[in-house]
Amino acid sequence: AKVEDELIQRIAACLEKKTQPHLAVVIVGDDPASHVYVGSKVRACERLGIRSTHIELPANATEYEVRQTIESLNKQDGLHGILVQSPLPNHMDEEGLTDLIDPSKDVDGFHPQNLGRLVQGRMDGMLPCTPSGVMRMLSWAGIETEGKTAVVLGRSRIVGMPQSLLLSAKGVDSTVTV
């Protein structure tokens, strides 16, 4: 509830400036879990006053079609965030397609430019959602991290690796074992 209240205030400030936040979600294929997840994102956008565009491409879409979709979204000035839902069909280069997303619109924080900032200890780019959420939960719970040892299970590009970087960043200063 607290996060949602903060978001509502931030969105209201944007709307006062005549800017409605706008998220595009691209889903390729028919993975049931992905469709449920995207549906919840679209409903959350509606609830919060964020405009959302939901783009569905068939499982047999070509990588070129997805590339064209991303490049088109990058060019839209009134669009503030792009999310390409994982997993993509096996015939697609997920990392290559992620690399095409404008880093300033990369809401997942997976673009190499955003991950590179994180490696440098900079928090001025888009940060991966789940690791950022973990850091907020630690803060809300009053758990001090400085000088502590943290264990991160897994090295995934989506959670494990960015989580270890956030925990070892300046100001957090944990010793991390992966």
For each of these PLM feature ranges, what is it?
Residues 47-49, 72-75, 101-104:
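Non-catalytic terminal and connector segments of soluble metabolic enzymes
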